[in-house]
Amino acid sequence: MTDVALPPAALTLPNDSVGVVTPQRMHFQEPLKLRNGSSIAGYDLMVETYGTLNADRSNAVLVCHALNASHHVAGVYADDPRDVGWWDNMVGPGKPLDTNRFFVIGVNNLGSCFGSTGPMSTNPATGEPYGAAFPVVTVEDWVNAQARVADVFGITQFAAVMGGSLGGMQAVAWSLMYPQRLRHCIVVASTPKLSAQNIAFNEVARSSILSDPDFHGGNYYAHGVKPKRGLRVARMIGHITYLSDEDMAEKFGRELKTEDIRFSFDVEFQVESYLRYQGDKFAEYFDANTYLLITRALDYFDPALAYGGDLTRAMAQTQASFLVASFTTDWRFAPNRSRELVKALLDNKRPVSYAEIDAPHGHDAFLLDDPRYHNLMRAYYDRIAEEIGA
């Protein structure tokens, strides 16, 4: 279990923070069979927990992360109090996912670059980093690995599995692969599968990495370099899809970086400066091989594929109650994609609540502190708490 410590004397945190947290490294020796037919053994998963697991282990909530996030869902680290968890506004004492009532688990997925076994890890067969030799992983593989984490805690059924974007896909996969192991499935700003346009954006991003001279076929670690140029462009492309046109107009408009145009190809507009800043920052902390793996996992997710593309038939296996939420200006995973999932659930007479939230911030709205959005989540978790007596 993650240690939750008192903050250092010099560090003052809000009363609704989970405080200073320490992640736990879980080691699993038993091979994990992957969807591609291979397996991986002797792997690690980074885990953080918040709150207290009750006696009957009924108050656990699994939070699944999106592309560039990790197990660090909430709180801060003692050695870097600026590193606040990526969903800190959602998880904590008195917050929508209230850690006074729920035991919350964050798991860093296989293939990531934040401590779980991935391309940067040492391949026991060679003694060198896996690099391009790391197996392609899928959403289903992540869910199977997360189930093993639940087993370690003795959790037979989650009160809820929750996620936004790619995290929402993992929540859907949980409802299909382990239907008896979750009471509620909370899917935010997500989709039952990527559209051709979504896949196209991922392909352009991957191509920018693959064509970077410093990529070296994915084995750039041995060369002491990193394909930062490709990562920068990939992040810039992705970031455009996370924001709405309205939000970009409000933040940047056509504002120039300097007073007058300079008739050059240097940064002229504020929006250019912003994208370059985001790209530079991302290239410093993220791994290119991980980016390739996770975007490909996004592409492959399609639970209806085994049912001839019939999502209604696919969702017939679910037993959980659902909350599905979308945002009006999200064009990466537009509201109609969430409605596809809702329709499939209703066709199967499954209990589902749906909210389409009018918010100007595009796809990234699921990470923001919108009162209507948070009130929705708070009310739904109040309902879950009442069900389980938390």
UniProtKB/Swiss-Prot annotation:
Superkingdom in the source lineage: Bacteria
Reactions this protein catalyses: L-homoserine + succinyl-CoA = O-succinyl-L-homoserine + CoA
Active site: 165, 330, 363
Alphabetical UniProt keywords: Acyltransferase, Amino-acid biosynthesis, Cytoplasm, Methionine biosynthesis, Transferase
Site (Important for acyl-CoA specificity): 332
Similarity-based family: Belongs to the AB hydrolase superfamily. MetX family.
Name recorded for this polypeptide: Homoserine O-succinyltransferase
Organism: Cupriavidus pinatubonensis (strain JMP 134 / LMG 1197) (Cupriavidus necator (strain JMP 134))
